[in-house]
Amino acid sequence: MATKFPKFSQDLAQDPTTRRIWYGIATAHDFETHDGMTEENLYQKIFASHFGHLAIIFLWTSGSLFHVAWQGNFEQWIKDPLNVRPIAHAIWDPQFGQEAVDAFTQAGASNPVNIAYSGVYHWWYTIGMRTNGDLYQGSIFLLILASIMLFAGWLHLQPKFSPSLAWFKNAESRLNHHLAGLFGVSSLAWTGHLVHVAIPESRGQHVGWDNFLTTMPHPAGLGPFFTGNWGVYAQNPDTVNHVFGTSEGAGTAILTFLGGFHPQTESLWLTDMAHHHLAIAVIFIIAGHMYRTNFGIGHSIKEMLDSKAGLIGGKSQGQFNLPHQGLYETLNNSLHFQLALALASLGVITSLVAQHMYALPPYAFMARDYTTMAALYTHHQYIAGFIMVGAFAHGAIFLVRDYDPEQNKGNVLDRVLNHKEAIISHLSWVSLFLGFHTLGLYVHNDVMVAFGTPEKQILIEPVFAQFVQAASGKALYGMDVLLSNSDSLASTAGAVWLPNWLEAINSGTNSLFLTIGPGDFLVHHAIALGLHTTTLILVKGALDARGSKLMPDKKDFGYAFPCDGPGRGGTCDISAWDSFYLAMFWMLNTIGWVTFYWHWKNLSVWQENLAQFNQSSTYLMGWLRDYLWLNSSQLINGYNPYGTSNLSVWAWMFLFGHLVWATGFMFLISWRGYWQELIETIVWAHERTPLANLVRWKDKPVALSIVQARVVGLAHFTIGYVLTYAAFLIASTAGKFG
């Protein structure tokens, strides 16, 4: 007899109900719990899957390159990047008749196409690509790379080529490889590409496979490098009149520290970026060689963590030198701990990418493609949110599955768990304080505006934030501090090291240090409320994962356990899983506030209508009326009685997103018994209906478990929420700026 899905669990495969399918899907990636899984096998499987992951990424990027080269307008866009709209790909089957076909035949194309809002055109142009041929070459190269990765993944699962457990647990060598090899060398390689290809192309000098070995990126060659006269490489940078992609106004410098933006492209100087990547390469290559591997020199991480020597003097413990003994084994033997730390880092970095992409745009002319700027910011902030929640989820799984209290007695982990009540209660009062005060201010202001006395609003200037902006050089507030005070030491140094920075921060035409007022103060605190509450839920979920006052023995129940009836006071909503389920909603809503704020603030800057944001953002009705309602009008008019526009696809997506989102509540606000009764009734009717009763099923249909229904509900809520806002964001921005 053929074995049933799932093959990895005999227990589930023999389940006679539809639970088999649901739990099979839910535990497919929980390798640890699969039948016959050994620790070594677990590491090998995960290692091999990394190659599969890379293959998917390369295939995806290859597809973007291929479709733009085949169906896009890259070569036309390069000639006039500010006015030609970039095409992502053709639309093969435009529905809804000739009107829709006409509406989507746009951006100079002869057939219906989609516009690209991902910024890839700007990226490829900046890094030196100039022809469709370049794009095709890139896509074929990545396709070959994806194939190699798939082969490598398969190869590392074969007994002869699968690494041993000891190899995976060699922390120092792994750090050497990741820091020096992956981060350091790839940054060095990228510097090489920028210096040898991108910078010459930006100055009108074509560099291709035919001449890259004979074209010198700098007239002095390697002479200054070997003689230690490195300053030569920074001399004669591009002038402020440089026309990107031509030799007009171009210099010869390759590694600079100019600061600010290229006046024409409004993006960071390529030579500054090359310098940045070179510095990162040097730092990481050195960092990768600090640990003891083959030669018996360098740091041993275990020795450092177990050391009793103090930071200063011989004291082994104290406020600034908390004990870390036992952490090496704990971290090195727990994949969940490692993953939690990696996700926490990646989450922060992804959010930083969102911030920096708009404040310091790295790609030529992207700052003027407003829809792309909005899409990239929102995209990266949402992804950061998902990743951060994942960090806490795996931290909790670590505490349930891998944490050994004996091994960690008295160290920092133990201390955190021992005073978890203090941590949780502090987060709680901060959340309560922020929530009541922020909402109180908004509601007060709403009432004042509603009663026709807007002058009675409570408006607070963000003086501390303005001070930070002034210290960084913003002169508008007249605070005369550090970089905004021309007599200060900071200004003297800044004039030497970052000559263009002050001009950039005070120009008023970019998104660097936007002027802030009372509306910003309020929404900043609303976002702080969301962040602190999300953190409270996540931290409490993780710290109580093994046990709490109500239920001291959660360990053997695992990470996700359902309600246990009224026994022990009821175990509803107290598993670690339940906390992350709740935190997901807070995370999504918080990032909603973040992206609403960013989008409205920037719309007012781009439309040169700052007064609208400043006046309407101080009360809730202003947000609802002047941001959400006002900006959804273009969207809702994608289809109307007078015809259709190229926003119609977003209008449909907006509608469909709401539908998916609302469907989520059917699973979220419901009980198993109701569904079980409904299922029994449908089954009964089915079995008694002629023709229909010829079709039977082997699994007995049963209602979803509480945890499953929550997952299905959360998935609909999340996907619907993101689809709805994505459609709103893109259509409202593209509707205004094309």
From Swiss-Prot:
<dbReference type="GO" id="GO:0015979">
    <property type="term" value="P:photosynthesis"/>
</dbReference>
<keyword id="KW-0813">Transport</keyword>
<feature type="transmembrane region" description="Helical; Name=IX">
    <location>
        <begin position="579"/>
        <end position="600"/>
    </location>
</feature>
<dbReference type="Pfam" id="PF00223">
    <property type="entry name" value="PsaA_PsaB"/>
</dbReference>
<keyword id="KW-0603">Photosystem I</keyword>
<keyword id="KW-0148">Chlorophyll</keyword>
<feature type="transmembrane region" description="Helical; Name=VIII">
    <location>
        <begin position="521"/>
        <end position="539"/>
    </location>
</feature>
<feature type="transmembrane region" description="Helical; Name=II">
    <location>
        <begin position="135"/>
        <end position="158"/>
    </location>
</feature>
<feature type="transmembrane region" description="Helical; Name=X">
    <location>
        <begin position="647"/>
        <end position="669"/>
    </location>
</feature>
<keyword id="KW-0411">Iron-sulfur</keyword>
<feature type="binding site">
    <location>
        <position position="675"/>
    </location>
    <ligand>
        <name>phylloquinone</name>
    </ligand>
</feature>
<keyword id="KW-0793">Thylakoid</keyword>
<protein>
    <recommendedName>
        <fullName>Photosystem I P700 chlorophyll a apoprotein A2</fullName>
        <ecNumber>1.97.1.12</ecNumber>
    </recommendedName>
</protein>
<keyword id="KW-0460">Magnesium</keyword>
<comment type="function">
    <text>PsaA and PsaB bind P700, the primary electron donor of photosystem I (PSI), as well as the electron acceptors A0, A1 and FX. PSI is a plastocyanin/cytochrome c6-ferredoxin oxidoreductase, converting photonic excitation into a charge separation, which transfers an electron from the donor P700 chlorophyll pair to the spectroscopically characterized acceptors A0, A1, FX, FA and FB in turn. Oxidized P700 is reduced on the lumenal side of the thylakoid membrane by plastocyanin or cytochrome c6.</text>
</comment>
<dbReference type="GO" id="GO:0009522">
    <property type="term" value="C:photosystem I"/>
</dbReference>
<dbReference type="GO" id="GO:0009055">
    <property type="term" value="F:electron transfer activity"/>
</dbReference>
<feature type="transmembrane region" description="Helical; Name=I">
    <location>
        <begin position="46"/>
        <end position="69"/>
    </location>
</feature>
<feature type="transmembrane region" description="Helical; Name=III">
    <location>
        <begin position="175"/>
        <end position="199"/>
    </location>
</feature>
<keyword id="KW-0249">Electron transport</keyword>
<keyword id="KW-0812">Transmembrane</keyword>
<keyword id="KW-0602">Photosynthesis</keyword>
<keyword id="KW-0408">Iron</keyword>
<feature type="transmembrane region" description="Helical; Name=VII">
    <location>
        <begin position="422"/>
        <end position="444"/>
    </location>
</feature>
<dbReference type="GO" id="GO:0000287">
    <property type="term" value="F:magnesium ion binding"/>
</dbReference>
<keyword id="KW-0472">Membrane</keyword>
<comment type="similarity">
    <text>Belongs to the PsaA/PsaB family.</text>
</comment>
<feature type="transmembrane region" description="Helical; Name=IV">
    <location>
        <begin position="273"/>
        <end position="291"/>
    </location>
</feature>
<dbReference type="GO" id="GO:0016168">
    <property type="term" value="F:chlorophyll binding"/>
</dbReference>
<dbReference type="InterPro" id="IPR020586">
    <property type="entry name" value="PSI_PsaA/B_CS"/>
</dbReference>
<dbReference type="InterPro" id="IPR036408">
    <property type="entry name" value="PSI_PsaA/B_sf"/>
</dbReference>
<keyword id="KW-0479">Metal-binding</keyword>
<comment type="subunit">
    <text>The PsaA/B heterodimer binds the P700 chlorophyll special pair and subsequent electron acceptors. PSI consists of a core antenna complex that captures photons, and an electron transfer chain that converts photonic excitation into a charge separation. The cyanobacterial PSI reaction center is composed of one copy each of PsaA,B,C,D,E,F,I,J,K,L,M and X, and forms trimeric complexes.</text>
</comment>
<dbReference type="GO" id="GO:0051539">
    <property type="term" value="F:4 iron, 4 sulfur cluster binding"/>
</dbReference>
<dbReference type="GO" id="GO:0031676">
    <property type="term" value="C:plasma membrane-derived thylakoid membrane"/>
</dbReference>
<feature type="transmembrane region" description="Helical; Name=V">
    <location>
        <begin position="335"/>
        <end position="358"/>
    </location>
</feature>
<keyword id="KW-0004">4Fe-4S</keyword>
<keyword id="KW-0157">Chromophore</keyword>
<keyword id="KW-0560">Oxidoreductase</keyword>
<feature type="transmembrane region" description="Helical; Name=XI">
    <location>
        <begin position="711"/>
        <end position="731"/>
    </location>
</feature>
<dbReference type="InterPro" id="IPR006244">
    <property type="entry name" value="PSI_PsaB"/>
</dbReference>
<feature type="binding site" description="axial binding residue">
    <location>
        <position position="666"/>
    </location>
    <ligand>
        <name>chlorophyll a B3</name>
    </ligand>
</feature>
